[in-house]
């Protein structure tokens, strides 16, 4: 299926299938947004507070990143969406000219299990900053995201924990659908902000599948699979994606939220997923760890103290082109911020390059040949 083109109902957005893998449901696509094209499959770095931790926008561009994620909940608390709007929106505020996506804040709100109360209207919680009572509703989440101005915005959903009773997950799925309808009605910028719906359902595959079928009827510009990477085994994520992704429209972007390990991304891409985000690259960097050719290295280890080779001699990132493993070992042991910056640059480059290589393999129909080993049970994911 070469160059299949499907244009979303929004004039500023277009999603094009460039090549379909002949052996899996994987595909290479081009997602056109108001701020540029996202070539998928694609890993998106996380810039929660309008910054990818320890990395400048210029450095981020050099990693090959095309789309960046920020968070509605955190930006509402600091500095506030009004400030961002006065600056001209997120892109100008953080000096990022490429596409952006904002999460709805639902995941963060629901992670405050002891501080929040769920009702049909929305969620009330106490701010972890000052204890003030804050209410998040579908309408408020969308208003905040409209003010922030990202290219893609996410519906406010209820993310059940893991593990959770089936009845509780059923209630969360039903409420997520009702809240999505309210998000659609509240959305004031559909021409330049694409609203994605989120499929919930925990580890209950029948609930996931029914949720997907229901959301598809709303004909949104894109769809996400949420509520994963919340403590469940990697095998469960694979089961969820395998059961859910095929039910989402082939002519629209599919986004797997919060996933960014090598194996989990390859498995999801084989199932038809296009977009990923995860804090893994910067979180590992802050712990002195580097992602190198599918493995995880602890740069604090003594073995690197007199190792003057580049971190990865095959990597063209700023870190690997200019500094040795010994220097990185010194920086991390000294707790110098530069060490975290250099490892963040490398780790982001590594995951962006990994998904870029997968795209190239799909375009040449060599995906299974080049990445099939990650589909095997023996392939161990690199945990954050």
UniProtKB/Swiss-Prot annotation:
Residues 258-264, 282-286 are annotated as: RNA binding. Transmembrane segments: none annotated. One of its GO terms (biological process) is tRNA wobble guanine modification. Disulfide bonds: none annotated. Its cofactor is Zn(2+). Binds 1 zinc ion per subunit. It is an enzyme of class 2 (transferase). Pfam families: TGT. Pathway: tRNA modification; tRNA-queuosine biosynthesis. Zn(2+) binds at residues 315, 317, 320, 346. Belongs to the queuine tRNA-ribosyltransferase family. Catalyzes the base-exchange of a guanine (G) residue with the queuine precursor 7-aminomethyl-7-deazaguanine (PreQ1) at position 34 (anticodon wobble position) in tRNAs with GU(N) anticodons (tRNA-Asp, -Asn, -His and -Tyr). Catalysis occurs through a double-displacement mechanism. The nucleophile active site attacks the C1' of nucleotide 34 to detach the guanine base from the RNA, forming a covalent enzyme-RNA intermediate. The proton acceptor active site deprotonates the incoming PreQ1, allowing a nucleophilic attack on the C1' of the ribose to form the product. Homodimer. Within each dimer, one monomer is responsible for RNA recognition and catalysis, while the other monomer binds to the replacement base PreQ1. This is Queuine tRNA-ribosyltransferase. It comes from Synechococcus elongatus (strain ATCC 33912 / PCC 7942 / FACHB-805). The gene is tgt.
């Amino acid at each position: 299926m070469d160059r299949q083109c499907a244009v979303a109902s929004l004039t500023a957005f277009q999603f094009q299938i460039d090549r379909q893998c002949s052996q899996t449901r994987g595909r290479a696509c081009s997602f056109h947004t108001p701020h540029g094209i996202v070539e998928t499959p694609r890993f998106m770095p996380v810039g929660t507070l309008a910054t990818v931790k320890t990395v400048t926008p210029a450095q981020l561009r050099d990693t090959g990143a095309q789309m960046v994620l920020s968070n509605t909940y955190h930006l509402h608390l600091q500095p506030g969406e009004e400030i961002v709007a006065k600056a001209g929106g997120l892109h100008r505020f953080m000096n990022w000219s490429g596409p952006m996506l904002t999460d709805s804040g639902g995941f963060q709100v629901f992670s405050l299990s002891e501080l929040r109360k769920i009702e049909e209207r929305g969620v009330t919680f106490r701010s972890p900053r000052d204890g003030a009572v804050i209410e998040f509703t579908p309408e408020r989440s969308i208003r905040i995201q409209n003010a922030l101005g990202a290219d893609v915005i996410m519906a406010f959903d209820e993310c059940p924990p893991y593990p959770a009773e089936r009845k509780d997950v059923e209630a969360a799925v039903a409420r997520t659908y009702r809240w999505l309808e309210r998000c659609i009605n509240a959305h004031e910028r559909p021409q330049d902000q694409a609203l994605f719906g989120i499929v919930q359902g925990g580890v209950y595959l029948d609930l996931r599948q029914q949720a997907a079928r229901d959301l598809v009827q709303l004909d949104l510009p894109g769809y996400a699979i949420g509520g994963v990477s919340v403590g469940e085994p990697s095998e469960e994520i694979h089961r969820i994606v395998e059961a859910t992704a095929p039910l989402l429209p082939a002519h629209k972007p599919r986004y797997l939220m919060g996933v960014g390990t090598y194996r989990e991304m390859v498995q999801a891409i084989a199932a038809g997923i296009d977009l990923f985000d995860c804090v893994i690259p910067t979180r590992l960097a802050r712990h002195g760890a580097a992602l190198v050719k599918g493995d995880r290295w602890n740069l604090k280890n003594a073995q690197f103290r007199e190792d003057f080779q580049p971190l990865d001699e095959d990597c063209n990132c700023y870190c690997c082109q200019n500094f040795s493993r010994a220097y990185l070992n010194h920086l991390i042991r000294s707790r110098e911020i530069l060490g975290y910056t250099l490892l963040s640059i490398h780790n982001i480059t590594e995951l962006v390059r990994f998904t870029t290589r997968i795209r190239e393999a799909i375009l040449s129909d060599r995906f299974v040949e080049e990445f099939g080993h990650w589909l095997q049970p023996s392939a161990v994911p690199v945990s954050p």
